[in-house]
């Protein structure tokens, strides 16, 4: 009986070591991305060609003064946003224009009035629906996943993205 008890205890200990508990946390988020894109007060630009950059605030995660979007990095109308936080952690987000690439719309009677500072067309303001997919991260955000949706509002040489969704952290 003692040998059986030792064998069972050994097997249970081996199973516990082989399958550690994986606690994941899923939380809702709201994000705001602010990117100067043009206009007399927006130049010279500090962003590399083919990118947009600025700040990001993501509820439950934090604020960043260092976020960069690489346009068309995953296909036409599919962009990759990298948000770097003060502690060095990063969050990588795929953003897809909806219903198609750069499908900005100008509401109401705004037509071609106003300067937006971006080659999306005339009309102030312009709106673009987007879908986000959290692709991963580094540091405290390593293994992050999730996604959401929202709208980019482009007016007066500034793009402001507002999104919400859920993020899962391991």
Predicted region positions:
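Sec/Tat signal peptide C-region and signal peptidase I cleavage site
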Residues: 17-23
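Cleavable N-terminal signal peptides
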Residues: 10-11, 21
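Bacterial N-terminal signal peptides that target proteins for export
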Residues: 1-8
């Amino acid at each position: 009986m003692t040998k059986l008890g030792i064998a069972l205890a050994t097997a249970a200990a081996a199973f516990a070591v082989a399958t550690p508990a994986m606690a994941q946390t899923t939380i809702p988020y709201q994000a705001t991305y602010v990117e100067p894109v043009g206009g007399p007060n927006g130049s010279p630009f500090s962003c590399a060609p083919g990118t947009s950059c600025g700040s990001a605030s993501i509820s439950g995660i934090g604020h960043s003064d260092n976020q960069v979007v690489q346009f068309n990095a995953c296909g036409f109308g599919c962009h990759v946003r990298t948000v770097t936080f003060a502690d060095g952690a990063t969050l990588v987000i795929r953003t897809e224009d909806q219903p198609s690439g750069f499908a900005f719309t100008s509401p109401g009677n705004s037509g071609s009035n106003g300067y937006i500072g971006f080659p999306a067309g005339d009309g102030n303001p312009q709106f673009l629906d987007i879908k986000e997919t959290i692709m991963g991260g580094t540091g405290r955000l390593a293994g992050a996943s999730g996604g959401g949706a929202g709208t980019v509002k482009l007016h007066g040489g500034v793009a402001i993205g507002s999104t919400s969704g859920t993020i899962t952290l391991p």
